[in-house]
Structure formats: C-alpha cells, structure tokens
Amino acid sequence: MLLTMEDVEHVARLARLRLSPDELEHMRDQLSKILDHFQMLQQIDVSAVPPTAQVTDLINVMREDEVRPSLPREQALANAPEQQDGMFRVRAIFEEAS
C-alpha cells in the first residue's frame, strides 16, 4: 500500500515532527512497507486461536520502583506547541459551571 506524501506529512504533523523532503520520502517508503505487512497479517486465519492466549506463562513481571532524576523542564517543554509559566498549555475541554 503506497501512501501519499500528504498522508506522511499528516502523520508527521500529528507527531509534531519536522521532516525534510528526503526524510518524508524515506518515511513514506517505510510506512508503506509496514502497512503492507499488516495487510498480510490480516489474511492469516486465526479462527482456531482462542481470543485470549498467554504464550509466555509470565504473570505481571514488573521491575522494582526506583527513584531517578526526572527530565529537565526545558527538555520536557522543548516540543510543546504552547507553554505558559513553565507548563504545557492545552485547550480547555471542560466548560465552567455557571
């Protein structure tokens, strides 16, 4: 499935990536190949496979929590489209009660 350049530009915009024309072409090729693989996977007959299957016998294997330094504020906000007073600025989604 060959994606259009507009498709790739749209995905890049959603991911907030600035890609050069060469990078856009490379991503178009890569993403098209990935979608081709998904199309092949969709053709596999899985009717005999139970809807939920655990193949590793692992149950909730999690690492111990450990305190580590956090990301510096400047780095965290570097790609934010809008920021205010050192915080992410997002559009309000709730209406205020009257």
Swiss-Prot record:
One of its GO terms (molecular function) is ATP binding. The keyword Membrane does not apply. Keywords: ATP-binding, Ligase, Nucleotide-binding, Protein biosynthesis. One of its GO terms (biological process) is regulation of translational fidelity. Its EC number is 6.3.5.-. It is an enzyme of class 6 (ligase). It catalyses: L-glutamyl-tRNA(Gln) + L-glutamine + ATP + H2O = L-glutaminyl-tRNA(Gln) + L-glutamate + ADP + phosphate + H(+); L-aspartyl-tRNA(Asn) + L-glutamine + ATP + H2O = L-asparaginyl-tRNA(Asn) + L-glutamate + ADP + phosphate + 2 H(+). HAMAP family: GatC. PANTHER family: GLUTAMYL-TRNA(GLN) AMIDOTRANSFERASE SUBUNIT C, MITOCHONDRIAL. Heterotrimer of A, B and C subunits. Belongs to the GatC family. Allows the formation of correctly charged Asn-tRNA(Asn) or Gln-tRNA(Gln) through the transamidation of misacylated Asp-tRNA(Asn) or Glu-tRNA(Gln) in organisms which lack either or both of asparaginyl-tRNA or glutaminyl-tRNA synthetases. The reaction takes place in the presence of glutamine and ATP through an activated phospho-Asp-tRNA(Asn) or phospho-Glu-tRNA(Gln). This is Aspartyl/glutamyl-tRNA(Asn/Gln) amidotransferase subunit C. The gene is gatC.
